[in-house]
């Protein structure tokens, strides 16, 4: 079992870092999944709940969280973590994995850490009982340099008049004085591309979104081309829907990165 746990963690890191990302399809049974956080081959839903868990642990509050991962065959494997009185208990549940051990194994661990760099993020239990002393329960890779293709088009504002477009290499900005700023041959710097790609991955941009409608016309349009996959979204700035909030935060991050460049280059 310990060997399989290590192999599973390694396989997840390979899948997350693969340079040929495709649109994420939900494995059979995903909709019935009642885990707090769902990891489908590196596409993670409800990642914010991991940070909520970390926050409560740091505040010494007794708390628990359930994380599900999916095998290539579509079977869920669960990491169920409980924090009680300064100690962590991990239940590694493979009872629904047709090709696994089909049992629940319990580990006790000393610490829980979040590690974040420019290209990867992981949540790790450390000081665990048994042969495996460190167990990654979530691993995310967002190294844009490993992608064969990453381009996007973002439209926003009144009538979606503003546009950040790396597909057609153009930038359009409404100056709010009756004039429009247009930049041709627009390109992002590598550092900017990395920041935006990281934000997209952490926003789980490849997953299916369930947007609420709170305005007559959508405030945002986003098209993403990543290797062989294409995703398109229209949504409004609705604060009562989690997907709307996450994608609006993503759009605002992209806008802020580009606006910072324009100000620094004195192009406005």
Residues covered by each model-derived region:
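Positively charged n-region of N-terminal signal peptides that target proteins for export
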Residues: 1-5
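Internal alpha-helical transmembrane segments of multi-pass membrane proteins, especially GPCRs
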Residues: 7-10
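C-terminal motif of bacterial Sec signal peptides marking the signal peptidase cleavage site
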Residues: 14-17
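N-terminal export/targeting and maturation segments
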Residues: 21-78, 86, 141-190
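Detector for Asparagine
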Residues: 33-34, 46, 58, 62, ...
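Short, well-ordered, aromatic-rich surface patches in folded extracellular/luminal domains
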Residues: 41, 87-157, 214-268
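Charged, amphipathic alpha-helical segments
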Residues: 43-59, 132-141, 146, 189-212, ...
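Short, structured surface segments that line ligand/substrate-binding pockets
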Residues: 53-57, 61-84, 198-239
């Amino acid at each position: 079992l310990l060997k399989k746990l290590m192999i599973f963690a390694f396989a997840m890191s390979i899948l997350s870092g693969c340079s040929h990302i495709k649109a994420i399809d939900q494995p059979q049974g995903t909709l019935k999944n009642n885990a707090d956080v769902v990891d489908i081959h590196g596409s993670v839903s409800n990642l914010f709940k991991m940070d909520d868990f970390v926050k409560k642990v740091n505040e010494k509050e007794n708390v628990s969280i359930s994380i599900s991962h999916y095998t290539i065959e579509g079977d869920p494997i669960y990491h169920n973590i409980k924090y009680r009185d300064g100690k962590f208990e991990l239940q590694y549940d493979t009872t629904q994995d047709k090709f696994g051990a089909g049992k629940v194994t319990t580990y006790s661990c000393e610490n829980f850490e979040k590690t974040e760099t420019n290209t990867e993020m992981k949540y790790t239990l450390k000081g665990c009982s048994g042969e495996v002393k460190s167990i990654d329960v979530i691993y995310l890779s967002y190294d844009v340099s490993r992608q064969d293709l990453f381009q996007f088009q973002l439209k926003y504002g009144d009538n979606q008049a503003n546009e950040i477009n790396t597909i057609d290499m153009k930038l359009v900005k409404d100056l709010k004085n009756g004039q429009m700023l247009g930049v041709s041959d627009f390109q992002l710097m590598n550092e900017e591309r990395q920041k935006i790609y990281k934000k997209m991955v952490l926003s789980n941009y490849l997953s299916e979104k369930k947007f609420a409608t709170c305005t007559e016309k959508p405030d945002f349009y986003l098209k993403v081309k990543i290797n062989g996959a294409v995703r398109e979204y229209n949504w409004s700035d609705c604060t009562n829907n989690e997907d709307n909030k996450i994608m609006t935060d993503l759009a605002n991050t992209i806008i802020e990165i580009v606006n910072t460049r324009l100000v620094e280059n004195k192009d406005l």
